[in-house]
Structures are given as structure tokens and as C-alpha cells.
Amino acid sequence: MRVMGLDVGSKTVGVAISDPLGFTAQGVEIIKINEEAKEFGFDRLGELVKEYQVDKFVVGLPKNMNNTEGPRVEASKAYGDKIKEIFNLPVDYQDERLTTVQAERMLVEQADVSRGKRKKVIDKLAAQLILQNYLDRMF
């Protein structure tokens, strides 16, 4: 079963995909979106769903450290509802607290990536971490 992980932000959606057996996650790409213009990248997402033969989505939920839900959680859930409607595939949610911090730390400490380059890959890596955490929890 192929699972697609999404890190939904206000300007981008980081995309990751699982291997066919659902054990490992790898980052795929970052889709630019514009919430104010109602451009959410669904066309590109559809292309990736077909290419990877996706069976399920996992959307990261950016909860606060005290486990409360802020406005970005609402936006992520709305995105999840919309992709469920468009693609007719199940959507699960994964707590994504600290995944962006973890991704940033990995890029700085392990890969020594410059700040400019980090901005180009951080959301994709965060999506990969969200999906891997989900897969680890499920299997």
C-alpha cells in the first residue's frame, strides 16, 4: 500500500511517498500553493497520486506543544477534507510537532546545508518525517 505524506503550509505543501510495502518514506517534492488565491496544488497532487498509485494520504497536524489545536490545524484538516473529496482516498492525520525543527537540525548538523538551500528542501523533508513517523506507528 502506497501512502502519501503531506506537510501543508500556507505557501507550500511538502510531499513524501512510502515504498510499496509501507515501511519507509522518501521526500518527493514541494508544491507551491497560494491560500489567498485559492490555489492549492491539487492538479500536481493528482499527477503524483497517479504516478505513485497512492492508496492513502497522511496529513501532518501542526499542534501546539501543549496539544491544543491552532489555526494551522484547521487549515490542514480542511486540506485533508478537500483531498479526500477530490481523490476519493482515505486521509489520516499525524501529529507533526517539531518535525520542521527536526528537519532543520538534520540539514544543519548532518548535511551542513546552507540557509538558502534549506528553505528549498525543508518542507519535503518535514513531509518525509511526518510520513515515517506515521508508518512507524502503524507497523
From Swiss-Prot:
Keyword Methyltransferase: no
GO biological process: rRNA 5'-end processing
This enzyme's EC code(s): 3.1.-.-
Cellular component annotations (GO), alphabetically ordered: cytosol
Enzyme class label: hydrolase
Key words of the record: Cytoplasm, Hydrolase, Nuclease, Ribosome biogenesis
Family from the record: Belongs to the YqgF nuclease family.
Function: Could be a nuclease involved in processing of the 5'-end of pre-16S rRNA.
Name of the protein in question: Putative pre-16S rRNA nuclease
Source organism (scientific name): Streptococcus thermophilus (strain ATCC BAA-250 / LMG 18311)
Lineage: Bacteria, Bacillati, Bacillota, Bacilli, Lactobacillales
